[in-house]
Amino acid sequence: MPVKDLTISGFPVLKESNPHPERPQKVGFVSLGCPKNLVDSEVMMGLLSRAGAELTRRAEDADVIVVNTCSFIESAQQESVNTILEMAAHKTGGKAKRLVVAGCLVERFRDQIRQDIPEVDAVVGTGELEKILSAAGLEPAPAPTNGRSDSPFVVLPSRPEGDARAAQGRFSRESWDGAIGDLPNYLYDDATPRVLATPGHMAYIKIAEGCDHPCTFCIIPQLRGKFRSRRFESVVAEAERLARGGVREITLIGQDTTCYGDCLLYTSDAADE
């Protein structure tokens, strides 16, 4: 899904952090797949904007093109490959100087992408969103501080069920050539900048990531990692900020939302308020 109306959510663009202040890098995004993947695209666009990049909806105007891919089913994989090849044409015969491939297809075919599509300059997996800055040729901007004291929560890496299944090899990716051995564990929070690509009145909030159930028919745990929840206060803080920005419809999403909070040890009554 190409980026539509872009709205900075949470933090201003810091132009001084751009290593090329005379002409900001123009970055174009193509986001494929589910709303959860769209949130990942919004996070990467937020990080790029904070670093001084200029986002564009026109691939022909972009210096850097990012394709955030899906590989849940075979048809999604093919759509991702076709889109990468389409965007590669803007590099070989157009203005673009860099082509970055991100998302689930990278987790499954990391080495094969770079081997078979030499136009690809960098890949960014689902657990590596913050690497989008170096992948796009930008230096990271200083992270904003949120002024919070230490969190009243202890966050476990995953649910005990997920840890037990991992110990049994149920999440193994050893058979995937080029796959990173460790499962993705990235999880954005309310301090992470986002650029909304949804209509102005609505937004998604990803409250959790990953899944602990390695069903035979599903590849999500290998692509997204074990289940992990965001802190309750973090979700509320993001919702409040979105509301202040004019959002009136918020959809909470995750691979397994019914398990939200199972991996959090609460030491406050915030969830009951």
Residue ranges and their predicted role:
Residues 1-261:
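Proteins enriched for Cys/Gly/acidic motifs involved in redox and nucleic-acid/cofactor modification
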Residues 137, 272-273:
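Residue-level marker of positions within ordered structural domains that often coincide
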Residues 266-271:
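Conserved small/polar residues in nucleotide/adenosyl-binding loops
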